[in-house]
Amino acid sequence: MGHFSEELQQVQTRINRFLEAQFEGIESHNAPLLEAMKYALLLGGKRVRPFLVYATGQMLGAEKQTLDYAAAAIEAIHAYSLIHDDLPAMDDDNLRRGHPTCHIQFDEATAILAGDALQSFAFEILTKTPNISTEQKLALIQILAQGAGVQGMCLGQSLDLISEHKQISLSELELIHRNKTGALLIAALKLGFICSPHFTDKRLEQSLTQYAEAIGLAFQVQDDILDIEGDSAEIGKQVGADLDLDKSTYPKLLGLSGAKQKAQDLYQSALSELEKIPFDTTVRALAEFIITRKS
């Protein structure tokens, strides 16, 4: 995992610099909006979604300069979603990545606007993507919009909110997280895929999608485990928040040991999909990172 950690750190450094550069020349007009956007987008984070964009795209021959734009766009969407998730009307969290959440650092109205603006910012960045065809550029916009909206992340959050204080089945829980967490991870792989010369290969797209579905669920299972076993200082947010909100989680439905086995099963499913892909791939190491991470 040492080699993978180095690659992840390189991605973090590259995407952070690129994201910072996207704000150059934008006037704040003394409003707090721009600072709130920067606060949410640039204040740390694992950058798993950008890593997936780069790893998939480079594996398939995409240019790194092209991938910068797709990676930045999906991270902007992710940052907006975290701002809104943390709001009092949603998950009501005060801590994110070891720092006060956006609505605590600024105020609730500014946080909402910062989330709105980051969503628009993501698509503005995508329209500037160089070295690809108009067809590919439109496909990037479509994939990110679908992954983030009513067929993906927003649907998952809505389902999650209405399931609070209710007993739900494992299949219902998986539906929530296939959308809330998994949809953007699938989008990340597809963005990298679309930026590559192989973007018309439907069989390859299918294997990548199934891999992403498995690691997307595994990511959430591990999140639920860390909400029980994690350390607040290490994971950068409050431990036990799911329990406080009476949310259905994998440990709640399967027990802690059952949840850990579920993560292992999903890891094996992800690896079996990668065996169908005839490329050397860093995304294999990502699957291991997801189920062993401590934050």
Swiss-Prot record:
Record-level GO BP terms: isoprenoid biosynthetic process
Cofactor(s) this protein requires: Mg(2+)
Keyword match Hydrolase: no
Keywords: Cytoplasm, Isoprene biosynthesis, Magnesium, Metal-binding, Transferase
Cell compartment(s), UniProt: Cytoplasm
Binding positions for Mg(2+) 1 per the UniProt entry: D85, D91
One cellular component (GO) term of this entry: cytoplasm
Principal location: cytoplasm
Residues that hold Mg(2+) 2 according to the record: D85, D91
Residue positions binding (2E)-geranyl diphosphate: R96, K180, T181, Q220, K237
Cofactor note as given: Binds 2 Mg(2+) ions per subunit.
Catalytic activity: isopentenyl diphosphate + (2E)-geranyl diphosphate = (2E,6E)-farnesyl diphosphate + diphosphate
PROSITE patterns: POLYPRENYL_SYNTHASE_1 (PS00723), POLYPRENYL_SYNTHASE_2 (PS00444)
Residues noted as binding isopentenyl diphosphate in the record, renumbered to the chain: K46, R49, H78, R97
EC number: 2.5.1.10
GO molecular function, one term: metal ion binding
Oxidoreductase in keyword set: no
Classification via NCBIfam families: FPPsyn, PRK10581.1
Family indicated by similarity: Belongs to the FPP/GGPP synthase family.
PANTHER family in alphabetical order: FARNESYL DIPHOSPHATE SYNTHASE
Protein name: Farnesyl diphosphate synthase
Gene name linked to the record: ispA
